């Protein structure tokens, strides 16, 4: 993405940056069998369990820059950013018994801290190693809480992960949803970001792999047409909402602004009932 788009997106997400005050939110960490110098590598997730969990976990891979830098600081969960609209729809998921975990890149893929990534690009996200790392995190999450069914949701650049993990993890997953998929590479220094998405053919994806996208998404890196063509197994199309921010930012069609409640309800129906909502809209749409 362009630098101005990235900066706007991070400003939009600043409301959920920082440290956790809720006692239920916890950092889940899985040690990995490799190191960077003398530092052991780990992959972490920020787990927010439902008050009355039904055994289903939605693992979220956030959009640009895609590296939330989840860690413990002074014994408290800390992060660079979280996906704003996921935070907005999370109460609906929790009410339905669904727990949520934001997934980070492993620490050897953090790169430089900031608004533009220098690591965790498609060469890692498309690799079997990524699947191996996420599998280790799933195992640790299951030790922390009873999780029977694992679902993935990748948003924007995070959908690169959800695509490849759907292929590599297969039957280990109950389902995957690719939200506002970035299918156009960033270009320039970011040519390695979203360069692999178009390599995946629709027929390669499992039957439980579906798409979620706003029909009028104006972010040039995430065209709706890609989702429409790829979605052999199901497409949930969002209409209406707000587009006052940067087109790739918080208050935009790209982030389902003013449609997060409807998107949350559709996700609950899909995860708990297996029902795909073809058109997600608000009153008056």
Sequence positions of predicted segments:
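Alpha/beta-hydrolase active-site loop
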Residues: 85, 113-144
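Primarily recognizes the serine-hydrolase "nucleophile elbow" in alpha/beta-hydrolase
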Residues: 139-204
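The feature captures the conserved acid-bearing segment of alpha/beta-hydrolase catalytic domains
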Residues: 175-240
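Structural cue for short, hydrophobic secondary-structure segments
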Residues: 60-63, 102, 153
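N-terminal cap/lid segment of alpha/beta-hydrolase-fold proteins
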Residues: 22-53
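Conserved alpha/beta-hydrolase
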Residues: 85, 90-111
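Short, surface-exposed "cap/lid" segments of acyl-processing enzymes
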Residues: 51-92
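C-terminal catalytic histidine-bearing segment of alpha/beta-hydrolase fold enzymes
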Residues: 233-285
């Amino acid at each position: 993405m362009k630098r101005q788009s990235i900066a706007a997106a991070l400003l939009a997400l600043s409301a959920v940056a920082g440290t956790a005050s809720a006692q239920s939110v916890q950092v889940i960490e899985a040690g990995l069998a490799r190191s960077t110098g003398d530092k052991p590598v780990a992959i972490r997730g920020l787990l927010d369990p439902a008050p009355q969990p039904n055994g289903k976990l939605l693992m979220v891979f956030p959009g640009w820059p895609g590296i939330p830098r989840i860690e413990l600081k002074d014994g408290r969960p800390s992060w660079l950013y979280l996906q704003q609209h996921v935070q907005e729809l999370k109460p609906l998921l929790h009410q339905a018994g669904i727990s949520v975990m934001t997934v980070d890149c492993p620490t050897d893929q953090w790169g430089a801290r900031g608004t533009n990534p220098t690591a965790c690009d498609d060469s890692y996200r498309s690799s079997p190693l990524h699947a191996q790392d996420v599998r280790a995190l799933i195992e640790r999450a299951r030790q922390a809480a009873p999780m029977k069914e694992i679902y993935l949701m990748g948003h924007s650049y995070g959908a690169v992960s959800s695509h490849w993990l759907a292929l590599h993890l297969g039957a280990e997953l109950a389902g995957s949803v690719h939200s506002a998929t970035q299918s156009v590479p960033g270009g320039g220094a970011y040519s390695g970001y979203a360069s692999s998405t178009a390599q995946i053919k629709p027929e390669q994806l499992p039957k439980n792999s579906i798409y979620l996208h706003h029909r009028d998404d104006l972010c040039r890196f995430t065209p709706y047409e890609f989702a429409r063509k790829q979605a052999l197994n199901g497409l949930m199309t969002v209409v209406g909402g707000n587009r006052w921010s940067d087109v790739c930012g918080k208050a935009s069609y790209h982030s389902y602004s003013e449609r997060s409640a409807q998107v949350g309800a559709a996700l609950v129906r899909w995860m708990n009932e297996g029902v795909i909502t073809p058109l997600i809209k608000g009153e008056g749409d």
